[in-house]
A protein has these predicted regions:
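C-terminal segment of N-terminal export signals and the immediately downstream linker at the start
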Residues: 1, 22-48
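N-terminal export signals
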Residues: 6-27
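A long, amphipathic alpha-helix that forms part
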Residues: 44, 62, 74-77, 390-419, ...
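Secreted, luminal/periplasmic, and some membrane-associated catalytic domains
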Residues: 44-46, 55-57, 76, 80, ...
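Short, structured active-site-proximal loop/turn typified by the sulfatase FGly-forming signature C/S-X-P-X-R
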Residues: 63-105, 109-113, 157-159, 514
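Short, solvent-exposed turn/loop segments enriched in Gly/Ser/Thr/Pro and often Arg
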Residues: 87-107, 161-171, 422-426, 492-495, ...
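Substrate-binding rim/cap in mid-to-C-terminal beta-strand-loop elements of soluble/periplasmic
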Residues: 502, 506-556, 631-679, 693-696
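Short, surface-exposed loop/helix-turn segments at secondary-structure junctions
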Residues: 617-635
């Protein structure tokens, strides 16, 4: 009996063979298919054989984020179930500590030296440094295949949900749903619309109002005007009403801002939204969310939405646009006196261009609801006002609820043997402004709040962990005794206290040249005149003849001398308290010391000590050290001896010791081969990790 997934694989491959090789090749394929389908497919039951849940940024260590003790105390009952039914311990990430590198490590069983994902934004020779020439969140960045690709070769079908590095899709069977920032599909990020009168915020954000500092906008500054041409009865306003025109992704929505209270403070408190000034889309008080509202958004397929790359003519981009019917949810974050507003739009993160097979997108939305994949974005936007914190918590709840609902869908509606599932919201919480710096005793901000305030913050963080625990409970309920459940994470999070603006240092040394726009805080690098620059997350590029044009690794006495000068200045760098932020510097040819590939790093790789983080921004004040608004991070930290970077590792299923605490922290590279051993599958030769014999029966 041919299964549905076998038939889909057959017809998709057969169609391609007919088109390319004719019916002779088709006949050969059918014979191979008959042989293949005569073999068992490895599916033991109707339940998934493996569910690997990888919440992003879920810190777990024995000192402060004592997750296993919380579980023993009853706070996390489903963590406790997995601990009792399987083995558990801590896992250590790889440098430089953040998401794309460590997901690639988990899913290939290799370090960056082998899988090649040295960073999120990577620069390689032959391309201008102004542009990211290799994106670490893209599946094509990996030099070796991930676990789902290897398993598919053995006719094991994967379901992949919100996994960084999974798109463009690498599997022909199964399901791929919205890989994060992989450059695949039509993704509309949440956005804040903020008063253009707030010049201080605009200057402070600079490029920080865009996805990864170069993508589509995450905050847009707008002006108000008097209301005009409304064809409906507008609510009475006790202050002069104002109007904003919000156009995003080709859809225009008007906002009528008014004061519904008859008092003397002239504080506006409400916004009525309409797409045509004839019908009401939503009428919201300050602090309220709308329901999901239908919108039609336009995506220019000839536009990469990257401010650093050349663009086609506007008419050509316009002709290339396609329309997406989707939904928006609106939050009035904050209002104030005349012309001040802060409004947030979050869009349904799911459409047919973000799911493969595409027809499943509609079914998911109908079954589970519009997708809220994660809260906020990178760089974070919900860090500037007290009301941003409330909005963050509400949006995080939407994300956690959606992912909890998706467990049953993935387990029962996708016909997949193995499932890989991530959620980014834990990372967003621990690297935001509001929590980690005030609850971790290693943070200089720890004493800035009272014990009572800290207890409230801990309560909010532990609630997030409880909701992750709820998702784990739903996973358990959708597995059976023959299934494996694995829980891990890519990295933890460390308190961030001070930003270190290395490019300000290089500008002061006369090694970096730029022009600053004093109005919006954006700047333009003079690459030809710039000899040294820091670029995310841990790379310094050096050329005594300038860094203009396509990047090529320099060499010779002048290069070596300049590189040594830069190293000395970095090692001597200290803040006003004499604390030096540099932990380690290695030359590109020694990148193997940090398990990094030489061809995808800068001329220097520089690691920062905890509480200090490298920032690419250039500021007009030329300050090198600045207290960070964010209070958590994970980039450019050597994780081995920084326990705050550690993560959980729990595994249960046939052949795994029960109620067993792993004696020492493991390495991320050991998770993949352990899973493959338990599944009874061959471990590829490129894998650097080894199975954890300690936990096997």
């Amino acid at each position: 009996m041919t299964s549905r997934r076998e038939f889909i694989k057959y017809i998709s491959v057969a169609g391609g063979i007919i088109a390319v090789g004719g019916f002779g090749a088709y006949y050969k394929l059918t014979e191979e298919f008959r042989k293949e389908t005569s073999l068992p497919d490895g599916r033991v039951t109707g339940r998934p054989k493996l569910y690997w849940f990888i919440p992003d940024g879920l810190r777990c260590e024995p000192v402060t984020f004592r997750v296993y003790e919380w579980a023993r105390e009853g706070l996390l009952p489903n963590f406790q179930k997995v601990m009792q039914s399987g083995s558990f311990g801590y896992s250590i990430p790889v440098f430089p500590g953040h998401t794309p590198t460590n997901f690639a490590t988990l899913l290939t069983g290799t370090t960056p030296k082998v899988h090649g994902v040295a960073d999120g934004p990577m620069r390689i020779e032959g391309y201008p440094l102004k542009m990211v020439s290799k994106g670490g969140f893209s599946s094509i960045a990996k030099k070796v295949p991930p676990i789902w690709y290897t398993l598919e070769k053995e006719n094991i079908v994967s379901g992949i949900l919100s996994i960084p590095g999974s798109t463009p899709p690498e599997i022909n069977m199964g399901v791929t749903i919205k890989g994060r920032w992989g450059g695949w599909g039509l993704d509309f990020p949440a956005i804040n619309f903020h008063s253009a009168q707030d010049i201080e915020l605009k200057q402070d954000q600079g490029f920080g109002n865009r996805v990864f500092y170069f993508g589509s906008e995450l905050t847009r500054f707008l002006n108000c005007r008097p209301p005009a041409d409304w064809a409906i009865d507008l609510p009475k306003s006790y202050s002069q009403p104002r109007e904003i025109r919000i156009t995003n992704w080709g859809e225009t929505i008007y906002g009528y801002i008014y004061n519904s209270k008859n008092n003397s403070d002239h504080h506006y408190d409400s916004v009525l939204f309409s797409k045509d000034k004839q019908t009401v889309l939503a009428n919201l008080k300050e602090g309220q969310w709308s329901n999901w509202c239908p919108v039609k958004l336009r995506w220019e397929t000839k536009n990469d939405y990257n401010i650093n790359t050349p663009k086609r003519m506007p008419w050509e981009r316009d002709l290339s646009s396609i329309t997406i019917n989707t939904e928006v949810k609106i939050k009035v974050i904050r209002l104030g006196r005349k012309d001040f507003f802060r409004i947030r739009f979050i869009y349904n993160n799911l459409n047919k261009y973000l799911v493969r097979p595409s027809h499943m997108a509609e079914d998911i939305v109908e079954s589970v609801g519009p997708m809220v994949d994660f809260v906020d974005n990178y760089p974070p936007q919900l860090i500037y006002f007290d009301e941003d914190k409330t909005t963050f918590l509400e949006e995080a709840q939407l994300s956690l609820d959606w992912h909890a609902k998706m467990v049953g869908y993935m387990a029962n509606r996708t016909d997949c043997d193995v499932i890989f599932h991530s959620i980014y919201t834990p990372n967003q919480m621990l690297t935001s402004r509001w929590w980690l710096g005030y609850i971790d005793p290693e943070s200089p901000r720890y004493r800035q709040v009272s014990d009572m305030q800290r207890n409230v913050l801990w309560g909010e963080v532990k609630k997030m962990y409880q909701q992750i625990d709820t998702i784990i409970g739903k996973i358990i309920n959708n597995l059976d005794e023959e299934s494996y459940l694995v829980i891990s994470s890519d990295h933890g999070a460390v308190p961030l206290f001070k930003e270190v603006r290395l490019n300000n240092l290089f500008a002061k040394m006369g090694l970096l040249k730029f022009k600053m726009n004093s109005y919006n805080g954006e700047y333009e690098i003079d690459w030809a005149a710039t000899r040294v620059i820091y670029l995310k997350m841990d790379n310094i590029y050096i050329n005594p003849d300038g860094l203009g044009g396509n990047y090529k690794r320099a060499s010779g006495p002048a290069y070596s001398a300049l590189r040594e000068t830069v190293k000395r200045n970095l090692l001597d760098l200290a803040d006003e308290n004499g604390i030096k932020p540099v932990d380690k510097i290695v030359n590109w040819e020694d990148a193997g010391q940090l398990n990094l590939p030489m061809d995808r790093v800068g001329d220097l790789v520089v690691a920062n000590r905890p509480n200090y983080g490298w920032i690419e921004d250039i500021s007009s004040d030329m300050m090198i050290f600045k207290e960070s608004l964010k209070s958590g991070y994970k980039q450019a930290i050597i994780p081995d001896n920084v326990k705050a970077m550690w993560t959980p590792f729990l595994i249960m299923g046939p052949g795994v010791k029960r109620n067993y605490r792993i004696s020492e922290p493991i390495r991320h590279i050991d998770q993949y081969p352990t899973i493959m051993r338990l599944l009874g599958k061959r471990i590829p030769k490129f894998v650097e990790g080894v199975p954890l014999e300690e936990i096997l029966i």
